[in-house]
Amino acid sequence: MPNLLEKTRKITSILQRSVDSLETELPYNTMASRLADIIDCNACIINGGGTLLGYAMKYKTNTDRVEEFFEAKQFPDTYVKAASRVYDTEANLSVENELTIFPVESKDTYPGGLTTIAPIYGGGMRLGSLIIWRNDDEFSDDDLILVEISSTVVGIQLLNLQTENLEDTIRKQTAVNMAINTLSYSEMKAVAAILGELDGNEGRLTASVIADRIGITRSVIVNALRKLESAGIIESRSLGMKGTYLKVINEGIFAKLKEF
């Protein structure tokens, strides 16, 4: 059987794999699955709001009611609030504890069920919780060491992703501000009219029709589109006689136009 060092290496190797986005469906399934295999348990990871980021079920313990929480990828508020008050790892909680992940209606089915909850921190902030559980058999000290390491690994990844997301948001806002500052009043008017024509973030438009409707020349619209495209705000493609296909790739422009 693998020793503690080998198990630790398997978990820390996940740091070498990037999680590209928290928007991805269940971005931490790999971590949960790896931990479940190594410790021989069920495992799940939730963020501070109770959103499920990943899980692995080696053993069936859920009722249909609880299974709905996993399918919805959202834990109930009462459980999330209780878990948020766990500041250090709470190990081997019985089915009678309020923090047990075993359904209340399954207490008689799994009388020896045990739950362990480890808080996930990053940069001094509480980012979520790592939860593991078994039908029986206590989690050993070695198991708990692996849980602590896993929560640290997830905390590092979550913090890095949040930092990257913040930097990306700042870059996009800066690009929008710079683009807006290059537009004349007429060009701003044209941009507002153009984006108002789109169906969501993309669509087809005819510059001459918009120009006639808002009382500007077609060249004003063309210049405005060129400035936005060069700033990386939009993508455009000529459709010939059918007009121009437009797609917004920096949605920050919509919020900025509300100030216009």
Curated annotation (Swiss-Prot):
Gene3D superfamilies assigned to the protein according to its UniProt record, in alphabetical order = 3.30.450.40, Winged helix-like DNA-binding domain superfamily/Winged helix DNA-binding domain
Q: Which SUPFAM superfamilies match?
A: Winged helix' DNA-binding domain
- Annotated keywords: Cytoplasm, DNA-binding, Repressor, Transcription, Transcription regulation
One Pfam family this sequence matches:
CodY
Cite the residue spans of the region called GAF domain: 1-159
Per UniProt, subcellular location reads as: Cytoplasm
Annotated signal peptide = none
Q: Which GO terms describe its biological process?
A: negative regulation of DNA-templated transcription
Residues of the DNA-binding region = 207-226
Superkingdom assignment: Bacteria
For this record, the Gene Ontology CC terms, alphabetical, are: cytoplasm
Which Gene Ontology molecular function entries are recorded, alphabetically?
DNA binding; DNA-binding transcription factor activity; GTP binding
- Function, in words: DNA-binding global transcriptional regulator which is involved in the adaptive response to starvation and acts by directly or indirectly controlling the expression of numerous genes in response to nutrient availability. During rapid exponential growth, CodY is highly active and represses genes whose products allow adaptation to nutrient depletion.
The record ties this protein, via PANTHER family, to: GLOBAL TRANSCRIPTIONAL REGULATOR CODY, GTP-SENSING TRANSCRIPTIONAL PLEIOTROPIC REPRESSOR CODY
* HAMAP family according to UniProt: HTH_type_CodY
Per the record, the similarity remark reads: Belongs to the CodY family.
Which protein, by its recorded name, is this?
Global transcriptional regulator CodY
